[in-house]
Amino acid sequence: MIKKKYTIAQILPALNTGGVERGVIEVSKALIDNNFKSIVISCGGHMETQLRRTGAIHYKLDVNSKNPFRWQKIRSELKIILKNENVDLIHLCSRAPAWIGFPLGKVLNIPVITSVHMRFRKTNFFKNIYNSILTKGDIIIAISKHIEKSIKASFPKVGDKIKVIHRGVDLNLFNSSNIKPARIIAQSQLIGLTDNLPVIMMASRPAMWKGYFILIEALSKVNDNFQCVLIGAADGDYKFQNLLIKKI
């Protein structure tokens, strides 16, 4: 008897820089290494190449749309993909894709899990409704105890469905001995680093709560010469870039 090869579909807004994107790629590799079929559905991005290296199949679809008037059309296209791929499990990794994809789990009788990567804030009624879709999964993955606490504070009735799965880190990616000197020199020249000055680096996507402004404020109190590199701060958010420039 031939053992069935299960197909897992991960759906996220895009494949650009971020923890969600990195997690999807790493989960995809783990799935394929364990004889699962991995498909990923997103609107694309510069991490597509990394995803394909895992052996996953990528479908490009506008699942990042926050326009409810477009969801039905996108949902119809997504339904075709899920049926053609005989998907056994859907993993919804963000709110907009969840609003599009969750109803299909019910229609096609496919189990759905959701994952929560950000804090839920009690802002207003409509925001709570928008956030609530991530609590509809058969299982809710929280990436930390802090996130679990945040979910329970906003949606106390879903506590039994939450599973905390902490983010892993591939230490080989951050091992300096694995980086060739020529690459280090090339990147230093590209950034414009000066020799013999200490380098302070912050690597993060552009977001107010990531701590950029705290770092800039702290560095303003340092009297010694240094170089500060903000990796990722210019990733498309021009309004945020302008705020940083004004602060500096």
Where are these regions (language model features)?
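N-terminal strand-loop element at the rim of the active site
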Residues: 5-6, 10-18, 22-70, 152, ...
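A conserved mid-protein helix/loop that constitutes part of the nucleotide-sugar donor-binding site
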Residues: 18-29, 198, 202, 207-221
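Glycosyltransferase donor-sugar binding loop
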Residues: 41-46, 169, 203, 227-242
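An amphipathic, basic-hydrophobic alpha-helix
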Residues: 53-54, 65-89, 99-107, 125-132
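Short His-centered aromatic/hydrophobic patch
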Residues: 92-98, 116
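A conserved, positively charged/aromatic
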Residues: 112-143, 149, 156-157
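Carbohydrate-associated surface elements
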Residues: 146, 168
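A short helix/loop element that forms part of the nucleotide-sugar donor recognition site in Leloir-type
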Residues: 175-193, 243-246
